[in-house]
């Protein structure tokens, strides 16, 4: 539920490496 400061409209979350996932075109962590 914490925004990772990254969008995932066109590309996947690079921050997925630290546990972030794409939700509603924005990368979130928990």
Curated annotation (Swiss-Prot):
One of its GO terms (biological process) is defense response. The keyword Ribosomal protein does not apply. It holds the Pfam family Cyclotide. This is a cyclic peptide. SUPFAM superfamilies: Cyclotides. Disulfide bonds join 4-20, 8-22, 13-27. InterPro entries: Cyclotide, Cyclotide_bracelet_CS, Cyclotide_sf. Signal peptide: none annotated. There is a cross-link at residues 1-30 (Cyclopeptide (Gly-Asn)). Expressed in leaves, petals, petioles, and runners but not in roots (at protein level). It comes from the Eukaryota. Keywords: Disulfide bond, Knottin, Plant defense. Probably participates in a plant defense mechanism. Belongs to the cyclotide family. Bracelet subfamily. The presence of a 'disulfide through disulfide knot' structurally defines this protein as a knottin. This is Cycloviolacin-O17.
């Amino acid at each position: 539920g914490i925004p990772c400061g990254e969008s995932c409209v066109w590309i996947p979350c690079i921050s997925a490496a630290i546990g972030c996932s794409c939700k509603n075109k924005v990368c979130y962590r928990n």
